[in-house]
Amino acid sequence: MSKTDVSGLSQLGRQVDAPTSPETAVLERVPNTNAGTDYVVRFTAPEFTSLCPMTGQPDFAHIVIDYIPGDFLVESKSLKLFMTSFRNHGSFHEDCSIYIAKRLVDLLDPKWLRIGAYWYPRGGIPIDVFWQTGEVPKGVWLPDQGVPTYRGRG
């Protein structure tokens, strides 16, 4: 097993303040030492929070990000800090969800990426947002995201 070069990272192994906005959050990447192999990386954020841009009230989501890396992997501490940066950020559910996915695509240029953002109800209506870069490459095992649609007490 080869060792990953982490010399260019600015956050891993250091105490870092949470970014004040998603736009200023620094996402970092590391080389993928298995770049010749297609495999799925999954990140799950079951307690994602942001703010409603109209009321300032908190919004909550269970977010699942799956991607097939190319030459790079997202460094997980930077992803955690990026996701945390939404806590005081006002934006609609759709905007948050797609922004997260596109920032990762811009950073990583993955072979494939999808996001499932399962937002908890506000005003009685749950909003789920799904986006992916294209068809899943053949031969890749892609498990279900495992988040049931919202049923309330039903």
From Swiss-Prot:
Reactions catalysed, as given in the entry: 7-aminomethyl-7-carbaguanine + 2 NADP(+) = 7-cyano-7-deazaguanine + 2 NADPH + 3 H(+)
* Taxonomy of the source species: Bacteria, Pseudomonadati, Pseudomonadota, Alphaproteobacteria, Hyphomicrobiales
- GO CC list: cytoplasm
* Location of the region described as Disordered in the Swiss-Prot/TrEMBL record: 1-24
Tell me the organism: Allorhizobium ampelinum (strain ATCC BAA-846 / DSM 112012 / S4)
Statement: the UniProt record of this protein carries the keyword Oxidoreductase: yes
- The reply on keyword NADP is yes
UniProt GO MF annotations: preQ1 synthase activity
What residue spans carry the Polar residues bias annotation?
1-13
Its gene name is queF
- Keywords from the named record: Cytoplasm, NADP, Oxidoreductase, Queuosine biosynthesis
Which residues are recorded as binding substrate? Answer: 74-76, 93-94
An example of a Pfam family matching this protein is: QueF
- Predominant location category: cytoplasm
Q: Which family is this sequence assigned to?
A: Belongs to the GTP cyclohydrolase I family. QueF type 1 subfamily.
This chain's function reads: Catalyzes the NADPH-dependent reduction of 7-cyano-7-deazaguanine (preQ0) to 7-aminomethyl-7-deazaguanine (preQ1).
Can you name this protein?
NADPH-dependent 7-cyano-7-deazaguanine reductase
Pathway the protein acts in = tRNA modification; tRNA-queuosine biosynthesis
